[in-house]
């Protein structure tokens, strides 16, 4: 017995439909977060709450900005996230407001004390942090996996590396070897040599006066910086005003010579966040 062309066509269509229906639209997603917790999703999340600016920015550069339903108060890039509901900050995120968003994934730092409570209420939570450049790459990789677009992490990291290399090529020879102190807080928390900021400065030819032995973001004695006598002081413009009133700081050569890089908030945000804009930060 032979089949006509139309019969063969119907068989092929049925065979294709069976294959299509037997394969799920999305394979389950499983990622181990930075606290060692296994985060499992049946499908890519569609209602994401991000409680850290670097995580918000990572979601967006990976093409999933439209899946964000709310963020922390400090998330301000890209422009579209400014319009999203704001749920508080690292220490005061509002639990009720988070629940009201009905998120299928909450992204936050392990420093946020809400993680355990959110899990107890049945929410899927991923705790992700980064203190150095390899950890920033790992953060991007894990966020991309959680979003269901794992291949995009490598693409975005290549963009970051390309931007850093371009910035390296722009640094004048005379500027290389500049001894830098980078302040992240007026409470004298500094970006050490082993932090992502410190590693970025090193790649740009600077010498960090806070060596790796002190850790990524150590709290320093005020006298430490005075004794270190950096050639350049970098900090947020909002913190620069009271610099000369610090005991002994008016005697520092960098202060006397005006070698103070007081960054406006928009630039400071780019440089201080361990996320996908670090390539742009190298060019600030």
Model-derived segments and their meaning:
Residues 112-120, 232-252:
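A ligand-binding cleft/hinge motif common to bilobed small-molecule-binding domains
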């Amino acid at each position: 017995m032979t089949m006509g062309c139309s019969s063969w066509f119907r068989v092929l269509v049925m065979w294709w439909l069976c294959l299509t229906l037997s394969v799920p639209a999305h394979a389950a997603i499983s990622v181990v977060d930075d606290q060692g917790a296994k985060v499992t999703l049946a499908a890519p999340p569609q209602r994401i709450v991000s409680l850290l600016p670097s995580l918000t920015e990572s979601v967006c550069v990976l093409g999933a900005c439209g899946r964000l339903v709310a963020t922390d108060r400090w998330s301000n890039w890209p422009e579209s996230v400014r319009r999203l509901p704001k749920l508080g900050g690292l220490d005061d995120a509002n639990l009720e407001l988070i629940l009201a968003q009905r998120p299928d994934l909450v992204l936050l730092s392990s420093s946020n004390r809400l993680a355990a409570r959110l899990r107890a209420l049945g929410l899927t939570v991923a705790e992700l942090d980064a203190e150095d450049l390899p950890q920033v790459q790992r953060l991007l990789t894990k966020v991309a996996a959680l979003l269901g677009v794992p291949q995009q992490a490598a693409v975005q990291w290549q963009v970051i590396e390309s931007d850093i290399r371009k910035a390296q090529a722009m640094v004048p020879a005379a500027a290389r070897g500049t001894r830098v102190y980078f302040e992240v807080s007026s409470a004298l928390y500094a970006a050490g040599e082993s932090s992502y900021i410190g590693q970025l400065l090193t790649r740009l030819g600077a010498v960090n006066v806070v060596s790796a032995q002190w850790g990524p973001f150590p709290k320093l004695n005020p006298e430490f910086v005075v004794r270190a006598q950096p050639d350049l002081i970098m900090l947020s413009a909002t913190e620069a005003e009271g610099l000369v009133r610090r005991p002994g700081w008016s005697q520092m050569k960098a202060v006397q010579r005006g070698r103070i890089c007081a960054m406006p908030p928009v630039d400071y945000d780019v440089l201080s966040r361990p996320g996908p804009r670090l390539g742009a930060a190298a060019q600030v």
